[in-house]
Structures are given as C-alpha cells and as structure tokens.
Amino acid sequence: MDIKLKDFEGPLDLLLHLVSQYKVDIYEVPIVEVIEQYLNYIETLQVMKLEVAGDYMLMASQLMLIKSRRLLPKVVEHIEEEDLEQDLLEKIEEYSRFKAVSQALAKQHDQRAKWYSKPKQELIFEDAILQEDKTVMDLFLAFSNIMAAKRAVLKNNHTVIERDDYKIEDMMASIKQRLEKESVISLSAIFEECQTLNEVISIFLASLELIKLHVVFVEQLSNFGAIILRKEKK
C-alpha cells in the first residue's frame, strides 16, 4: 500500500503550518521546537522512502544551522545568528500575508464563477478532512514527531532493524481487535510495543486506512496532544 499526501506548497508553507499550531505571534513561537518538527517531518519522509524536494532539503540545512547555534553555549552574542533567525521569521510572516491574499483572491474567483452556467469542476485532494477537523497531513506531522522519538529509542537500545514485511491488512485487523477490547487506544502506546521502524510505519499506515474508511475515529484534544483512536465517534 502506498501513502499519498498532499504536498505543501513549499518549505515556508510547511513552516507556517507548524508555527500556526502555537496560536501565538510568529515572533513568539519556540523556534527550536518548530525546527525539530520540520526536521522530523523530512526525516520521516526519507525513512518511508517518499520523495523530498530539493528546496525542502535546502531549508532543512539552514534550520539545522540555526538550531545548532541556538544550542551552543552563549558566550558572545552573534549578530549573524540573530539575523538568520530574524530573516526566517520575517519570511514566514511575509508568506503568511501572501497566502492570505491568495486565498482571498481565490474566494472572489469562486464567487464570480457561480455566475456562469457551466458548473465548476470539483478538484479532489488527497489531503481530505478526516474526523475532528484533522487532515491526513496533520496526522502525518504528529506521526513524524512520534517516529523521531521511536528512532532515538531504537538507536539507544542498539536494536537491530530487521527487514520484516508487515502486511497492512494484518495490522488493520490487529488494531480492530485491540479496539474491541479497549475501545480507546493511543497511537504512541501502540508504537511503544514495536520492535522495528518497519513495524511502526505499517501500523501508522494501517491506522490511517482505518480512519479514512471510518472504521475507527481519531481524536487529538490539543495541537500537541496524544493521537487517540476510538471505536465509536463521540
């Protein structure tokens, strides 16, 4: 089974999405946390052998530079460091304004299109809304953070990554059986039991498929809260 995700319009679009989750002014977000989430997303795409565009990798290298300088001991204030971070935040803010204008123009275009007799062709995106206003991409971003933590655990435990083949159908059946007993489970709890990254990926894909089929329902009470799977919709 292949996973198909709607791409962001570029690295700034991804960064804006991550920043907007904090519900604060762009210049007040914890920039290191945002950078870590961005890097987790890129690394997860690579682990899952999904294509990563060059501009995303270029941004990743710039973010790693900002993060490394942020984490170094503050002996002397570096003006260049402040400039890099300030420049990044200004670009995100500028992109946010540009996107808002673009969306407003698109809305006006849609309104005008209603006056024509020819019906407007519907566009179907892979990034469909699931339950609780969560999209496929929202779940993937949350999963990438969990995936990064799991990679660290496996690395620290010197776990051997075996080339096991996990069938999505088997994982779907396993999740449904578990929900029959527990009715509510968290994805992170399931991932903790996994022994390989392949198993983690397969469980995520199985969960995503069950959610899209409305066999199970997803819930995340806060932007950075646990992802909960439940048998019945609340």
Swiss-Prot record:
Task: Fetch the Pfam families from UniProt.
Answer: SMC_ScpA
| Functional summary from the UniProt entry | Participates in chromosomal partition during cell division. May act via the formation of a condensin-like complex containing Smc and ScpB that pull DNA away from mid-cell into both cell halves.
Q: Which Gene3D superfamilies match?
A: 6.10.250.2410
Would you identify the family this protein belongs to, as annotated? Belongs to the ScpA family.
Annotated Gene Ontology cellular component terms? cytoplasm
State the protein's name. Segregation and condensation protein A
What are its GO biological-process terms? cell division; chromosome segregation; DNA replication
Keywords (A to Z) from UniProt: Cell cycle, Cell division, Chromosome partition, Cytoplasm
Organism lineage: Bacteria, Bacillati, Bacillota, Bacilli, Lactobacillales
KW Signal (keyword) present: no
Q: Which gene encodes it?
A: scpA
Q: What is its main location?
A: cytoplasm
Q: Where in the cell is it found?
A: Cytoplasm
How is the quaternary structure described?
A: Component of a cohesin-like complex composed of ScpA, ScpB and the Smc homodimer, in which ScpA and ScpB bind to the head domain of Smc. The presence of the three proteins is required for the association of the complex with DNA.
Note the HAMAP family from the entry: ScpA (MF_01805)
